[in-house]
């Protein structure tokens, strides 16, 4: 690819990274999309669409494919990272020596650092230093609908007001894509991780056959767990009533486009964890997020019974129905209690 002066370089050519790149290009911006597999990038360039995940959405002319990381990063100061959470830190280490001096980083990754449960902002600061502007986007966004130009809304939080304003300008499209700024950097990140866990639980409930009442109760109590953990970390509880909290939670718990929900449904129907992951065929973020969110909750002394039971199913071999009955058998509580 010849040198491009791009408004954004997108790191990660999976379904969501591709959808965001398409959205940016459709907004009239020059965009570079980089993926780690040169063969995959060559296929995208040849087909001018992502046949595997978004087969009916052609790439705009202003979307440029690139397999050379240095070339991709030289094209723009604005870098949008869209990779699974368990490789987030690894990717930042990879791009750090190749970034422009004026680089700014935004990510659409939803999750926490593998094993440690740290927020991704802490990973980014450790790898990239304290001076680089950071931002995160999160909210109810299925890649297929976003790429198709169907109405979508997200939350955006940043450490830098100028960067936040620039990102709103780049992403916001009045016809289909609304971007709401939010000063709560912690809350916007955390919502995307916890909702993955609760979505697995909602899927389990439906897989068992518990019905709409149970699913709705689980979503509601899951939101309580999300808010409880968020407050302990210093987030604004109001954030969890917005796009990055309730919005993403409802979407992921109720629609079968969600891998986490489908994964949970298979577990509820009796499939083992490995078999369910293989059948999904893509990364199920909630599997790792469950372990990470549980670790974070223990570290801050926050009780999260739904998360705990999902962890028991995923990592300790507990039966999904047994886990559900454990939750139902808990002692009576006040609705607004801290446990």
Swiss-Prot record:
Signal peptide: none annotated. It comes from the Bacteria. SUPFAM superfamilies: 6-phosphogluconate dehydrogenase C-terminal domain-like, NAD(P)-binding Rossmann-fold domains. It catalyses: sn-glycerol 3-phosphate + NAD(+) = dihydroxyacetone phosphate + NADH + H(+); sn-glycerol 3-phosphate + NADP(+) = dihydroxyacetone phosphate + NADPH + H(+). Pathway: Membrane lipid metabolism; glycerophospholipid metabolism. InterPro entries: 6-PGluconate_DH-like_C_sf, 6PGD_dom2, G3P_DH_NAD-dep, G3P_DH_NAD-dep_C, G3P_DH_NAD-dep_N, NAD(P)-bd_dom_sf. The keyword Nucleotide-binding applies. Keywords: Cytoplasm, Lipid biosynthesis, Lipid metabolism, NAD, NADP, Nucleotide-binding, Oxidoreductase, Phospholipid biosynthesis, Phospholipid metabolism. NADPH binds at residues 15-16, 36, 110, 143, 259, 283, 285. It is found in: Cytoplasm. Its main location: cytoplasm. The active site is at residue 195. One of its GO terms (molecular function) is NAD binding. Catalyzes the reduction of the glycolytic intermediate dihydroxyacetone phosphate (DHAP) to sn-glycerol 3-phosphate (G3P), the key precursor for phospholipid synthesis. PANTHER family: GLYCEROL-3-PHOSPHATE DEHYDROGENASE (PTHR11728), GLYCEROL-3-PHOSPHATE DEHYDROGENASE [NAD(+)] 2, CHLOROPLASTIC (PTHR11728:SF1). Belongs to the NAD-dependent glycerol-3-phosphate dehydrogenase family. NCBIfam families: PRK00094.1-1, PRK00094.1-2, PRK00094.1-4. HAMAP family: NAD_Glyc3P_dehydrog (MF_00394). This is Glycerol-3-phosphate dehydrogenase [NAD(P)+]. It comes from Enterobacter sp. (strain 638). The gene is gpsA.
